[in-house]
Amino acid sequence: MPGNRKAELKLGGAFAPGERASHHGGFTLVELLVVIALVAILAAMLLPALSNSQAAAKRTQCLSNLRQMGIAANVYVGDNANVYPIAYYSDGENNIDYAWDLTTIEGNPNRVIPGLLWQGQGNVQIQQCPSFTGRANWLTDPYTGYNYNLSYIGHGQYESIPEPAKSSDVHQPPKTALFGDGQCSGGADKFMRAPFPNPGDAGFWGRNGGTQGFRHQNRSNAAFCDGHTESRQGRYTNNCENSTVAPGTGFLSPDNSAYDLE
């Protein structure tokens, strides 16, 4: 009926029978505080997981870098009468410093090219550990973070044993470290040293470098003479010179077993 129809119409902002008012207001202060607290809790839960994920990705990239360096070393050995690259030597007459990783031609400015390991060519950027944020001990080095087994493999011009080892000298290649995460009190020394002297290395004493950096979630990465890589957790700090070990650094074994040729 017309009268009933009019009664059902909205009048002065009222609602027809059966209609419900909807709430169009904003959040209350209490509701906003609850939401903010929940977001903060979720962030606190997710950030460590994200940080761990990023650290794991850097560790994986570092292992890949070391694996490529190991491959390059074995290629060098195959091309050079089974002899490993020497760790370093200097050509004073021509002002050239040769090292396993980079060759520096002195000048103004100095020119840096791929080193002996790369036989003068290659992508040397893989020599930069993605987790290393310090500096090189050698100020001319554009890349840093890795070191090479000087005590038993590479030796060098001014070492007691100047000639590098042959691959046939390494009796257990899976046990002998070739390259690794270098770090010491002064930065990143590019030369890896065993914790104790090589029996034939009379010049060992007095060196305060060559330790490994345990910067991958308390692990240190290394490549071995057979080409495989490892991420090692054991950090050994007892050696003949306490000054060799800085916070976050150490050796891969308590003795020379991770470095020697046996």
Q: Predicted regions span which residues?
A:
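Amphipathic alpha-helical segments typified by the pilin-like N-terminal helix
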Residues: 24-64
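N-terminal leader/signal peptides at the extreme start of proteins
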Residues: 1-27
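Short amphipathic alpha-helical "recognition" segments used for binding
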Residues: 10-14, 23, 35, 58, ...
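Short, well-structured segments within or immediately adjacent to enzyme catalytic domains
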Residues: 60-262
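Intrinsically disordered, low-complexity regions enriched for glutamine and histidine
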Residues: 21-22, 44, 214, 226
